[in-house]
Amino acid sequence: MEKTRTKLAEGVYLTRLPARKFKTSLLSAQFMTPIAAETAAAQALLPAVLRRGTMRYPDMGALSTRLDELYGAEIDYTVRKKGECQCVGFVASFIDDAFTPGGEKLLEPVAELLGQVIGNPVTKDGRFLPEYVDSERTNLVDAIRSILNDKRDYADLRLLQEMCAGEPYGVSRFGDEKTAQALTGEQVYEAYTRLLSSAPLELFYCGSASAERVEAALMAALSNLPHKAVQAIPQSQCHTARKEVKRVTDLMDVTQGKLGMGFTCGSDDFSALMMGNTLFGGSSNAKLFMNVREKLSLCYYASSLFHRQKGIITVSSGIEFQNFQKAYDEIQHQLKAVQDGKLEDWELEGARSTLCNAYATIGDSQSKLENFWLGQTATGRDDTPEALAEGVRTVSPERIYEAMKTVSLDTVYFLKGEGAEQ
């Protein structure tokens, strides 16, 4: 599949992937804006409110009926964080023209409906309906609270909040509970007008329709959107290493400790760092899993994640409170083993295979392709999955070791039980 990216209007770009192997087409529209603590919650709430109805289809029942008429098409709202960019919008999925009864064309009516959801939402006196705002605000607060209920997710979020305190990357895609609870309809509508007027709009299409049809359908569907004084898509800034390791402990009513460790990466060798992280803790054959969890039984789980947009690696683990120091020391010991090249051939080849397979499967799913290219756009990269896989296949062990030698501990976060000894 050969990707193309076309400017349709000021601040409006279309990424198109022609494909005939799927029975559906996918159409996505995403507003790209800097993520900030002050605006994240309102912008996260916005697409849920927009999805409640348009002036022509003023409630979810009417919208659902129209989607049913389009052979069960779907329009779902999305809230994502890519690098230091908050991406809010919609993804539509519908039967590809090649598979509709009589070859009926669905691209144009689906694009038109998507344009109504974005540009002509149901309003009263120039504001969103209060009942829609209230209902979706409750859902947003519940989503934020659900992170707290899953202590693994909560600890991962708290590590990023502490490591990237004062930086956009430390802000949750949903914002914080206090801000979300206090949101008013006026604030949500202000967020709407702000995004319409200044946020870049990234469109994505994957299906069999020609470029001319896709562009014409989207131009017609979005013709009523205001002219944009567009901000640039924010590019993530690499995290600057601290002179001293930051250590944070939270006390909570938990029975299992959560140890998180954040590391800075001083190298920009992306392929080498991807391989190094996979060897360290990015797969079920990685050193953290095989040694810290399986061999030494110091963790219930242990894994690492390379945040390429930010140039950091984070470790997530669940431990007994009394095993904090042992797990902490062993995690660093396993990192040093990778840095020193203490790896078997099967580990290297296993890591290559894991990453190459992951890149290969992106092309098997339209939603994965959309998510991948949204991330590439948000971070200013244009590498294809195939190019990334080739980079992994050809990176030498020496490059991996050298890149991983630049990885250093920055932040330690520990969630433990109240009154528990460490």
Regions picked out by a protein language model, each given a short descriptive name:
Residues G185-A221:
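Non-catalytic, conformational "gating/processing" segments within enzyme and secreted inhibitor domains
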Residues S64-T65, N120-I144, V230-T240, H333, ...:
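Acidic/histidine-enriched alpha-helical segments
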Residues Q43-R51:
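Active-site SXXK
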Residues V110, A191, V214-A217, A272, ...:
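Hydrophobic side chains in well-ordered alpha-helices
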Residues A92, T100-N149:
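Hydrophobic alpha-helical hairpins/lids featuring a short glycine-rich hinge
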